[in-house]
Curated annotation (Swiss-Prot):
It catalyses: N-acetyl-L-glutamate + ATP = N-acetyl-L-glutamyl 5-phosphate + ADP. Gene3D superfamilies: Acetylglutamate kinase-like. Its EC number is 2.7.2.8. Keywords: Amino-acid biosynthesis, Arginine biosynthesis, ATP-binding, Chloroplast, Kinase, Nucleotide-binding, Plastid, Transferase. The lineage of its organism: Eukaryota, Rhodophyta, Bangiophyceae, Bangiales, Bangiaceae. CDD domains: AAK_NAGK-C. PANTHER family: N-ACETYLGLUTAMATE SYNTHASE (PTHR23342), N-ACETYLGLUTAMATE SYNTHASE, MITOCHONDRIAL (PTHR23342:SF0). This is Acetylglutamate kinase. It comes from Pyropia yezoensis. Pathway: Amino-acid biosynthesis; L-arginine biosynthesis; N(2)-acetyl-L-ornithine from L-glutamate: step 2/4.
Amino acid sequence: MLTNSERVKVLSEALPYIQQFSSRIIVIKYGGAAMKNQKLKDQVISDLVFLSFIGLRPILVHGGGPEINFWLDRLKILPKFDDGVRVTDQPTMDIVEMVLVGRVNKDLVATINKQGGKSVGLSGKDGLLITPRPNGKANLGFVGEVQNIDTKLLKILINNNYIPVIASVAADKEGQSYNINADTVAGEIAARLSNAEKLILLTDTPGILRNSSDPSTLISHLNIQEARDLTQTAVISGGMIPKVNCCIRSLAQGVASAHILDGRIDHALLLEILTDQGIGSMLVV
């Protein structure tokens, strides 16, 4: 339990950040344990609504891997992966779209609205928000990359104080649906919005670690060159590589900072954005 003086200190520490980030866009990729655990999910949504009420303009991009796997199993379709990427044939694509757009997205929208926010659920198909292209690996099926982002619809929503919630599914000009990595979608959206302040990736790790098995080796602040050097020396490895590359790409296109943080921590978003110390890894140019 905080004392009265500690409560005042917390509020005082947050004030400069509230002033600095007022009316600025933050793009948050949401997935992992924070999506599976109901308590963490409620806290993420509560943080999101709070940030909206104090003047920030959050955009939420989500995945939904565990829910997809649940429905594939229920329909007796065996999930397949290649180097950690979901192999997406047409039956799998149908399930991915049903789950991400029809279930996960609408549940998040309803939760935001229930907590007092105003939210609109979207997929990449809505308003031609995302134009995909095949990723070039035929064995992966309908796994896509981002070819283009049209931000007009997002700007209308955030300018009217709505929180866009985006499922990472899109369709090409022939109407073929593609499953796109949610980290990639979040990074590309942040990069295409000229006044995006932050890209935040919620993960199941503390951030970028010098020793992947030791949370105390968290690197709390680094620039693009340092991130590239750590990748070359294999300090950054495995599943962290595409996340860091996503951050680097968004920074190179004008996003002020990119953050990788542990979504399993209570109120991770508020701690990262509104405190001096933060809790994750912040990348800057």
